Amino acid sequence: MELYEEWFNNKNYWFSKNFEIDKYLSNKYFTPINNIIFNINDSKKQLITKIILLDQIPRHYQRINPHSNINLFSYSKKASIISELILRKFNNLR
């Protein structure tokens, strides 16, 4: 949940292509991506955090590791599945 707060309190993370930001986010959050456990009973905040982890953090990682073999499409696909769940499960997206 730390990522959720950090992400929404630092909107400069969203669209910047800044090496230091990419490095910081990658070092802090990329490894836990492989440990994500999906639970249909997760809260909205937990699900949104998982979407950020899956959809955004790999992009930051790939920018600082351009020769890595990560599959961004695979991560984004998982994030879109969680997004669909949120849309079905919750009436209010706030």
Model-found features: residue ranges?
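Intrinsically disordered, low-complexity activation-like regions
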Residues: 1-94
